[in-house]
């Protein structure tokens, strides 16, 4: 069970990934800010458990972070709504909402700390004040691979490995709620070099993206009458 129970309608995180018979889950900080640095709580973390619910004995608590909760493998995230297992390097990647700016794409790092709310990845509080001392990133924290300021509100990610768009293989597709946009991050050799807009403001606020065995892409929006869309190559 997620601890501690928090009465809040904000920042749930929400994604689950299965890798090597382990379950990874992204947990938002529920709008509580510095709780993401509290190693005795789940909010603001990435957890890793066996599929039967038991705790892997090689998690950080048993190796490098003895004070952490046993199921937690990374802390310091705000609202990680996107998560994907790369078919290329077998690493787990996330997208995370910042506050007013500071959204990011990054890798799940064993025993790592993304730094929320000591740092804000280039964003500010909604009233315009600094997050921490205003530094976008500090040494000893996990560094995002790509950030967005202003925010795009990234809702999910997909690392493309299909045949329909061969030129996109290995790149990251990012769905945006705020700008109703599908972005593509050009991702090679563990680095993002640039981004492209595939389309914008066509289907509403984009909530999720999936790919089938043919490489065809499907998207769902989060409008009041949420609908499923198939992307055309035309």
Regions found by a protein language model. Give the residues of each.
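Beta-propeller domain segments
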Residues: 29-196, 204, 214, 226, ...
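Conserved catalytic network of the ASCE P-loop NTPase/AAA+ motor domain
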Residues: 211
């Amino acid at each position: 069970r997620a601890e501690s129970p928090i009465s809040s309608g904000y920042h749930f995180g929400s994604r689950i990934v299965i890798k090597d018979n382990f379950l990874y889950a992204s947990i938002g900080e529920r709008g509580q800010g510095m709780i993401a640095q509290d190693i005795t709580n789940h909010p603001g973390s990435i957890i890793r458990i066996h599929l039967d619910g038991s705790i892997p004995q090689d998690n950080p608590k048993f190796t490098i972070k003895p004070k952490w909760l046993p199921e937690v493998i990374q802390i310091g995230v705000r609202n990680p709504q996107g998560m994907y297992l790369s078919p290329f390097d077998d690493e787990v990647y996330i997208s995370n909402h910042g506050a007013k700016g500071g959204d990011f794409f990054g890798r799940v790092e064993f025993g790592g700390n993304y730094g929320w709310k000591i740092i804000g990845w280039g964003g500010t509080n909604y009233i315009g004040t600094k997050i921490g001392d205003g530094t976008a990133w500090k040494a000893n924290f996990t560094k995002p691979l790509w950030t967005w300021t202003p925010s795009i509100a990234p809702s999910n990610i997909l690392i493309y490995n299909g045949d329909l768009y061969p030129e996109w293989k290995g790149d990251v597709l990012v769905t945006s709620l705020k700008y109703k946009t599908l972005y593509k991050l050009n991702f090679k050799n563990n680095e993002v070099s640039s981004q492209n807009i595939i389309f914008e403001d066509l289907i509403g606020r984009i909530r999720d993206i999936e790919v089938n065995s043919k490489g065809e892409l499907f998207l769902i929006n989060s409008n009041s009458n949420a609908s499923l869309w198939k992307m055309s190559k035309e």
